[in-house]
Amino acid sequence: MEIKDIKAVYFVGAGGIGMSAIARYFLSKKLVVAGYDKTPSNLTHELEKEGMLIHYEENVDLIPEACKDAKTTLVVYTPAIPAEHKELVFFHENGFTIEKRAQVLGTLTRTHKGLCVAGTHGKTSTSTMCAHIMHQSHIDCNAFLGGISKNYGTNYILSDKSDYVVIEADEFDRSFHWLRPWMSVITATDPDHLDIYGTKEAYLESFRHYTELIQPGGALIIHKGLEMKQHVQAGVKIYEYSQDEGDFHAENIKIENGGITFDFISPIENVTGVELGQPVPINITNGVAAMAMAQLNGCTADELRNGMKTYGGVDRRFDFKIKNNKLVFLSDYAHHPKEIYQSAKSIRELYKDRKITAIFQPHLYTRTRDFYKDFANSLSLLDEVILCDIYPAREQPIPGVTSKLIYDNLKPGVEKSMIHKEDVLDLVKNRDFDVLVILGAGDLDNYVPQITKILEEK
């Protein structure tokens, strides 16, 4: 189905962060946009205010009539939805065009210049940073992001003049194989989603295949030292980047007085005096990648500086809620051992002499089973670790796989305890903290507004 032929779009799994960005795209085109989600959330409520029709019961009768014409309705679904879902079965049985979110994005990369960011971690911050730099420049861009940009209050950026689209390329379920990037950053290839891939080798092969999809004339910007083989088409340039070395890197890094500045070293043009609007050490590396992609597509030195200085961050990515001399409280989406390591390392660099406590909710039974020792090692960088029950998301429990696997492997000297998420608010009321961070991609984040309020009132 061509995008020009679509009159209505129905989403099965409307409230996911990636799905909602596409929903907003079709809302901007003045189409009928509706969908199902399992539970209401802040995001679904926002979509409803913007004009989307959403229901929360798995019921074919609740699908709007405007979305029941197979000739003019596109159905978009998330892989997290089971194949036996009643509404999905209805659409299959009645000949509807049914596409994954990634297929829709793939179509857009064929009609626009796709600037894609892939990788096990760092892709949301890097893609959002790149989108902000591009959007405030003379070039502009559209963007489909994996988090809510604090600069724009949304995960979707619309431009009616730019041919560029910035996309977070998701490796889950091999979704990024639908894309045809003009350029792509690859931030990291630490194995993940082994419930899908089975082996580390299959995971790395998936990224290798992804590099084949970059269009001739474009470029691959890959983090230096990754354990993968790229296989680009003729005419695709390859650049390496990292914090300290590569074609693109940072020099003269200064972390002082709560701020971070550095010089951006580039084969095109060096940019001195770059200031991070969100001064977190990991954003030096993310910033180098984002600036590289933006510079390769025509952003000037002043636009790069201004974009980095005014970048406000992403919800749940090093998201500071309270920041003063007495107390620091932040929320971070880190849910892979390497992400947690980088978050913990950044927090430790910022607050060298303060006690750092993490409340961590592991995400997925399979990920916990596969990486519990790595989780324990990363969390052991902190002074105190409070573990919640595993957030299952799409999975069923696995016998013997609980948060205690991580608990038992934390290094000696780390204060540790286990807690049910329902008891977190009482814990916060009855404890004093120096630096407190909520870690994980589950639903513990729903408590963050209440935790913030409790801490502010103390």
Place the predicted regions along the sequence by residue.
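Nucleotide phosphate-binding/pyrophosphate-handling subdomain across enzymes
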Residues: 2-8, 18, 25-29, 256-258, ...
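Phosphate-binding loop of NTP-binding sites
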Residues: 25-31, 48, 62-67, 79-222, ...
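Short internal beta-strands
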Residues: 31-38, 220-224, 357-360, 382-392
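Beta-strand->loop->alpha-helix junctions that form or flank phosphate-binding loops
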Residues: 36-37, 55-60, 99-106, 144-146, ...
